[in-house]
């Protein structure tokens, strides 16, 4: 599936239906009074967060969303039918932003969350509502109220418990493949990962979502490389795993480069707890590992784990440390526990 995390779309709610001009026509009644009904309400524009979507790719091909207008009013005081709401389904983690991207208008963080974004126009008045003691046969009516319209941006921020970051070629794809069900592309060159990847990790009876984002390079905040566009996908993470390539020229400098980009990006990423992992342990001896770990501690790391995504060495202590930052139940675990609670409360089936 192609990944797209930003899309610009046009929205327009439905206009209200016009009121009717009508008069009663009955046998033996020469002058029937007005009986034109009101118009129906226009359709609303509604956003709904649904499960099973993790990209905005559908909005590349469908960019204009217009709700239907309400039906005309009719004779015999019949109000026109209201138009159905136009429901736009988006992935959980989607934000709706103003056209200039300066204001967040809606933020969808839970499955089933619905927001009525643009209200449909109210139906116009029929001539029956204009009848008065001085105007027994009014012919005026109201057109329906116009719908609302605007351009908005959709921005997807994936919901993950743990974020995985580092310079290009730090071994992030190999690592996420080793610890989760992800099937990320692996290659011996920089920028193998071009879009974020999600994987579900099961460790010691716990389950959490790990997000791998494309590698950062110096100047990413100014647009170098792939840039910092994908950093938004780890804004909601509780803890970050910072992979540092032990076979690189200067692991301490690599560590500082990534942290400088986090600080330049802002949004609180520089303050998130980090678990620093020297990756590719299988390519170095113990003395070299110890020396690089000491340099990372001096560079600001709180604790350093030596791991190998290729062989699995050292990964278990790292995942143990991750569990210490997670809540009692993560988003994936909550769904399972809710089902179990319902089963326990229900007990044996009874028709009563």
Swiss-Prot record:
Residues 329-352 are annotated as: Disordered. One of its GO terms (molecular function) is GTPase activity. Residues 160-327 form the OBG-type G domain. It is found in: Cytoplasm. One of its GO terms (biological process) is ribosome biogenesis. The keyword Cytoplasm applies. Residues 339-352 have a biased composition (Acidic residues). GTP binds at residues 166-173, 191-195, 212-215, 279-282, 308-310. Belongs to the TRAFAC class OBG-HflX-like GTPase superfamily. OBG GTPase family. This is GTPase Obg. It comes from Erythrobacter litoralis (strain HTCC2594). The gene is obg.
């Amino acid at each position: 599936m192609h990944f797209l995390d930003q899309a610009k779309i046009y929205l327009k709610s439905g206009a209200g239906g016009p009121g009717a001009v009508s008069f009663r026509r009955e046998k033996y009644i020469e002058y029937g009074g007005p009986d034109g009904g009101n118009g129906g309400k226009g359709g609303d524009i509604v956003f709904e967060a649904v499960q099973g979507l993790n990209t905005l790719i559908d909005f590349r091909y469908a960019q204009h969303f217009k709700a239907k207008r309400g039906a005309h009013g009719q004779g015999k005081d019949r109000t026109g039918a209201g138009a159905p709401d136009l429901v736009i389904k988006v992935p959980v983690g989607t934000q709706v932003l103003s056209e200039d991207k300066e204001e967040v208008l809606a933020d969808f963080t839970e499955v089933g969350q619905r927001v009525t974004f643009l209200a449909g126009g109210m139906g116009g008045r029929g001539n029956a509502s204009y009848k008065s003691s001085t105007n027994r046969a009014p012919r005026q009516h109201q057109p329906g109220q116009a719908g609302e319209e605007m351009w908005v941006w959709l921005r997807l921020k994936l919901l993950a418990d743990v974020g995985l970051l580092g310079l290009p070629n730090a071994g992030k794809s190999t690592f996420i493949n080793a610890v989760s069900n992800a099937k990320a592309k692996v290659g011996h060159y920089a920028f193998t990962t071009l879009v974020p990847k999600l994987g579900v990790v099961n460790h010691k009876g716990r389950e959490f979502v790990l997000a791998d984002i494309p590698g950062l390079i110096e100047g990413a905040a100014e647009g170098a490389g792939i840039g910092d566009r994908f950093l938004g996908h780890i804004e909601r993470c509780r803890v970050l795993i910072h992979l540092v390539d032990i076979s690189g020229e200067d692991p301490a400098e690599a560590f500082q480069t990534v942290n400088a980009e986090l600080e330049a990006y802002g949004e609180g990423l520089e303050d998130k707890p980090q678990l620093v992992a020297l990756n590719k342990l299988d390519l170095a001896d113990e003395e070299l590992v110890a020396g690089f770990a000491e340099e990372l501690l001096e560079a600001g790391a709180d604790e350093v784990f030596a791991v190998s995504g290729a062989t699995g060495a050292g990964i278990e202590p790292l995942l143990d440390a991750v569990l210490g930052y997670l809540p009692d139940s993560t988003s994936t675990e909550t769904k399972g526990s809710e089902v179990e609670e319902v089963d326990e409360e229900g007990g044996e089936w009874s028709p009563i």
